[in-house]
């Protein structure tokens, strides 16, 4: 008689379930069962655990009970118990112990699975992690704090792993390490009108371009200051002399007298810069020396005319690296560590500008020629503001960001008023828009610069919020 297929189905399921149930009974044990081990672990049958174990705790041969493991260097592999935490049983020639080895009656030693040194929280260096754990167990037995791992490698030294991700891909850190020694912090002082006491009024950044102490920075950083002090990365300070200034380009050259050769930065070719390149800005914002920010090049040729500077021949580098007054004058560098610009201007978050290195080269060449020919540098007039020309598109953008922005579409927008300057004394404030001077309409920042050169008194009308305010500013004549 033939048995129907449907009747065979329950029998088939029972046969499939049998090995599964056997596997479940040994759950929690990944190793093959040793001889004499029960089919199912019963924790209630485990012997009492000792309070202290020299080698740490481990599972017995059956994988059921926690027992004291053998310490590092102890025998293992025959009748001895398992090795302790982090240890493995190794027979001569470094072969891990196995069932085959045990059957051949070969004994082994408990060896730490980790061979590199580690530094403990007790300031001691241990040959491996197992020795540190043993020290921690001894410490706890004496009712002292446990010893924890602080770092790989010996105490007091780093662990250099050339194959680690941070070692392979931290190219920004490599650039900073290369350029930082040649970046300087600049502190500026002025004398008080009545007491003649000098007070610090501002700070900025610069970078060394010659081994004998020539330093490039922004013109607005050093102009109208009675004393300029330069601090190197090693903390040494020097008095600096202003050698040359180009206010239109906003580049200045200062010099310190230093014995010995100084580290220098080389200028790259800004004309070869591409949008999307990584750049690093370094400087001293808020007097925090060697502060690093990173970003990409947004565009390589943001023309001064696009910024509303009608008579400007400057093509700025636009970047989203953070630039502010403190790191003005510091270098903007590429990943080769070459200077491709001077940090100079921040319009708003994510929109900053740098003077291209090709302009710096031109300035340094012309400065060398002037000094070689002995030409005197004439005094210049200064009021102490940083400004940009306002256009309808920029006015709309600023109004979207600042609800109280004035309802104007042209003029000179004041980005910053430098402390202790004629502009501050006259009452100008950040975000003011200059709309006329001495009865003449102001359309761009160049209009303001032209009037400053010609006039000794500036009667300004500025738009502040929704009000027009009359302000008088008297420019100062300064040594560039």
UniProtKB/Swiss-Prot annotation:
Keywords from the UniProt entry: Age-related macular degeneration, Cell membrane, Cytoplasm, Disease variant, Disulfide bond, Growth factor binding, Hydrolase, Membrane, Protease, Secreted, Serine protease, Signal
Keyword Signal annotated: yes
Effect of residue 450 to H: In CADASIL2; uncertain significance; small decrease, if any, in proteolytic activity
InterPro entries to which the protein is assigned, alphabetical: Growth_fac_rcpt_cys_sf (IPR009030), IGFBP-like (IPR000867), Kazal_dom (IPR002350), Kazal_dom_sf (IPR036058), PDZ (IPR001478), PDZ_6 (IPR041489), PDZ_sf (IPR036034), Peptidase_S1_PA (IPR009003)
EC number: 3.4.21.-
Statement: the UniProt record of this protein carries the keyword Protease: yes
Stretch forming the signal peptide: 1-22
GO terms of molecular function: growth factor binding; identical protein binding; molecular function activator activity; serine-type endopeptidase activity; serine-type peptidase activity
Domain Kazal-like as annotated: residue spans: 98-157
Active site: 220, 250, 328
One record GO biological process: negative regulation of transforming growth factor beta receptor signaling pathway
Cited Pfam families: IGFBP (PF00219), Kazal_2 (PF07648), PDZ_6 (PF17820), Trypsin_2 (PF13365)
Tissues showing expression: Widely expressed, with strongest expression in placenta (at protein level). Secreted by synovial fibroblasts. Up-regulated in osteoarthritis and rheumatoid arthritis synovial fluids and cartilage as compared with non-arthritic (at protein level).
Ranges of residues in domain PDZ: 365-467
Subunit structure: Forms homotrimers. In the presence of substrate, may form higher-order multimers in a PDZ-independent manner. Interacts with TGF-beta family members, including BMP4, TGFB1, TGFB2, activin A and GDF5.
Family: Belongs to the peptidase S1C family.
Disease as annotated in the protein's UniProt record: Macular degeneration, age-related, 7: A form of age-related macular degeneration, a multifactorial eye disease and the most common cause of irreversible vision loss in the developed world. In most patients, the disease is manifest as ophthalmoscopically visible yellowish accumulations of protein and lipid that lie beneath the retinal pigment epithelium and within an elastin-containing structure known as Bruch membrane. Cerebral arteriopathy, autosomal recessive, with subcortical infarcts and leukoencephalopathy: A cerebrovascular disease characterized by non-hypertensive arteriopathy of cerebral small vessels with subcortical infarcts, alopecia, and spondylosis. Small cerebral arteries show arteriosclerotic changes, fibrous intimal proliferation, and hyaline degeneration with splitting of the intima and/or the internal elastic membrane.
Protein name: Serine protease HTRA1
Species of origin: Homo sapiens
Species classification: Eukaryota, Metazoa, Chordata, Craniata, Vertebrata
